[in-house]
A protein has these predicted regions:
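Conserved acidic carboxylate
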Residues: 117
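Alpha-helical structural signal in soluble globular domains
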Residues: 57, 78-83, 132, 156-160
Length: 176
């Protein structure tokens, strides 16, 4: 995407979703800024643009998208509609009712899977989702994400053998 278009999307997301205060992140770290994924994911215009832009980052050969619940499900749906690639949902933990599965939807043994994520700090949730996909027989070939907060996710994913393709970096949306 041309830089001006990407910056326009980043600016719109910043206006809608950047909160200032004292926040504890999923990783346990603290931050003066919180990029509220639900605020940008629930805006249809932003979600449509994100689906289009993230679709361009999905690795060639991807047969299935995998989206960790709850935050990445809307994004995964937008990317699936843009690419035509089917998706599945990765639960944080298997439920003790219904089918009791950790992966909802279809994941066929041996499929090449791209994870879709929203905001990554250390990548811990993404690594847990990748482990669940691998345990279910999928081959994780990449991860596309909206925002890399640049606090270790890229290195942690690389160490796990997962190519990471973030759409935006911290400096694009969060003040220095």
């Amino acid at each position: 995407m041309p830089r001006a278009e990407l910056q326009s999307l980043a600016d719109e997301m910043r206006l809608v979703a950047l909160l200032e205060g004292n926040f504890v992140l999923r990783s346990g770290r603290t931050s003066r800024y919180y990029f509220d994924k639900y605020l940008f994911e629930c805006e249809p215009g932003i979600l449509r643009r994100l689906g289009h832009e993230l679709a361009a980052l999905v690795p060639a050969g991807t047969q299935r998208l995998a989206c960790p619940e709850l935050g990445a499900v809307l994004l995964g749906g937008a990317v699936a509609m843009e690419t035509g690639i089917p998706m599945c949902i990765v639960r944080k933990e298997a439920k003790d009712y219904g089918t009791g599965k950790a992966i909802e939807g279809r994941l066929i043994q041996g499929e090449k899977v791209c994870l879709v994520e929203d905001v990554l700090t250390t990548g811990g949730a993404a690594l847990a989702a990748a482990a669940a996909v691998r345990a279910a027989g999928g081959e994780v070939i990449g991860l596309v994400g909206v925002l890399d907060r640049e606090e270790g996710a890229a290195a942690n994913l690389a160490a796990a053998g997962i190519p990471f393709h973030p759409l935006l970096k911290r400096a694009d949306v969060i003040p220095g």
